[in-house]
From Swiss-Prot:
One of its GO terms (cellular component) is extracellular region. It holds the Pfam family PROL5-SMR. It comes from Rattus norvegicus (Rat). Glycans are attached at N129, N136. GO terms for molecular function: endopeptidase inhibitor activity; hormone activity; peptidase inhibitor activity. GO terms for biological process: cellular response to lipopolysaccharide; negative regulation of peptidase activity; regulation of sensory perception of pain. Several O-linked glycosylation sites might be present in the C-terminal part. Residues 23-43, 99-146 are annotated as: Disordered. The keyword Signal applies. This is SMR1 protein. Sialorphin may be involved in the modulation of mineral balance between at least four systems: kidney, bone, tooth and circulation. Submandibular gland peptide T is able to directly or indirectly down-regulate cardiovascular depression induced by septic shock (endotoxin stimuli), or anaphylactic challenge (nematode antigen sensitization).
Amino acid sequence: MKSLYLIFGLWILLACFQSGEGVRGPRRQHNPRRQQDPSTLPHYLGLQPDPNGGQIGVTITIPLNLQPPRVLVNLPGFITGPPLVVQGTTEYQYQWQLTAPDPTPLSNPPTQLHSTEQANTKTDAKISNTTATTQNSTDIFEGGGK
């Protein structure tokens, strides 16, 4: 049974290796004396030939189009404001402000916070301090109930 697993595992490894080789293109021969044409260099770096010296000058431009959020969340005590304001392609400005809770009192303060009811504190109820001598031994309350 182990030999079957070994054969199956080798078959899978061989299949994966061959599938990876099929996707790969032909290997290039590196020639350090041959200068690469600037038009074939990667365009995302913005590589441009220098007209004065024949060397390549590098200008990196990353276009960012960020819009400020439509809804600003104003939580007291936290930083609020648009997250990032981009001007041009190289200048960044971040505008923020720190807000604290408003110390002014409420315009309509509540007159009474909560209505509370006191418990019945009548002392006319007679409560026995002794326990009954019956088998279940429960307290006996005399009178005073509603």
